[in-house]
Amino acid sequence: MSQLTHINAAGEAHMVDVSTKQESVREARAQAFVVMLPQTLQMIIDGSHHKGDVFATARIAGIQAAKRTWELIPLCHPLLLSKVEVTLVAEPAHHRVRIESLCRLSGKTGVEMEALTAASVAALTIYDMCKAVQKDIVIEQCRLLSKSGGKSGDFQAVAND
């Protein structure tokens, strides 16, 4: 098993020095699901929510969150992202919204945290916009789907839904 990269020899948290790493194209995809009552989901699909377009707001929130991950999570590097995409799909058969994010850059460190932050904040935004009509909405399965680039190699999650 690999060592924790954010812990130094003295056991203290520190920001990893990436200055000697080679730049490469790095990409990560993450997902989250927001599970709700059928009528809450239908309100989103119909566009009848009094706060406006839930998907558009969640998409923008996710993109903005990816760009600000370094401000939210200690020890993350500020990154010059070249692409952030947040896709939201209503899945009425499962009473949920599937959120998938994609982050890409050419740089010295990965974008997994940015992809996870984008999916998480998009999910939180859906909850925030819908909590007035349903308080027991569930955010679940927030996870990394894949990553590519960098010396640690590629990763692909096992499908579970």
From Swiss-Prot:
It is an enzyme of class 4 (lyase). The active site is at residue 128. One of its GO terms (molecular function) is GTP 3',8'-cyclase activity. Keywords: Lyase, Molybdenum cofactor biosynthesis. Substrate binds at residues 75-77, 113-114. InterPro entries: MoaC, MoaC_bact/euk, MoaC_sf, MoCo_biosynth_MoaA/MoaC, Mopterin_CF_biosynth-C_dom. One of its GO terms (biological process) is Mo-molybdopterin cofactor biosynthetic process. Pathway: Cofactor biosynthesis; molybdopterin biosynthesis. Gene3D superfamilies: Molybdopterin cofactor biosynthesis C (MoaC) domain. It catalyses: (8S)-3',8-cyclo-7,8-dihydroguanosine 5'-triphosphate = cyclic pyranopterin phosphate + diphosphate. Its EC number is 4.6.1.17. It comes from the Bacteria. Catalyzes the conversion of (8S)-3',8-cyclo-7,8-dihydroguanosine 5'-triphosphate to cyclic pyranopterin monophosphate (cPMP). Belongs to the MoaC family. Homohexamer; trimer of dimers. This is Cyclic pyranopterin monophosphate synthase. It comes from Erwinia tasmaniensis (strain DSM 17950 / CFBP 7177 / CIP 109463 / NCPPB 4357 / Et1/99). The lineage of its organism: Bacteria, Pseudomonadati, Pseudomonadota, Gammaproteobacteria, Enterobacterales. The gene is moaC.
